[in-house]
């Protein structure tokens, strides 16, 4: 009878230690995709800011006279 509680305790201790393969795969994909996504966001920001500045600067200059 002593073996059953010991077995249950060992099972509870071992289960969180085992990595979830799906979670590990998703985490590795996110780590790999992180820098690429950051570069894409930066490129989009540069393009958008360039477009806005090319539109807004002439408008502001026209308003100032």
UniProtKB/Swiss-Prot annotation:
**Superkingdom of the organism of origin:** Eukaryota
One GO cellular component, as annotated: extracellular region
Which species is the source of this protein?
Conus ventricosus (Mediterranean cone)
Q: What else is known?
A: The mature peptide does not contain cysteine residue.
Q: Where in the cell is it found?
A: Secreted
How is expression of this protein distributed across tissues? Answer: Expressed by the venom duct.
Alphabetically list the UniProt keywords. Answer: Amidation, Cleavage on pair of basic residues, Neurotoxin, Secreted, Signal, Toxin
Residues modified as Lysine amide: 64
* Molecular function GO terms recorded: toxin activity
Q: Where mainly located? A: secreted
Similarity field: Belongs to the conotoxin T superfamily.
Question: Could you identify this protein by its name?
Answer: Conotoxin VnMLCL-01
Q: Where is the signal peptide?
A: 1-19
Pro-peptide region(s): 20-43
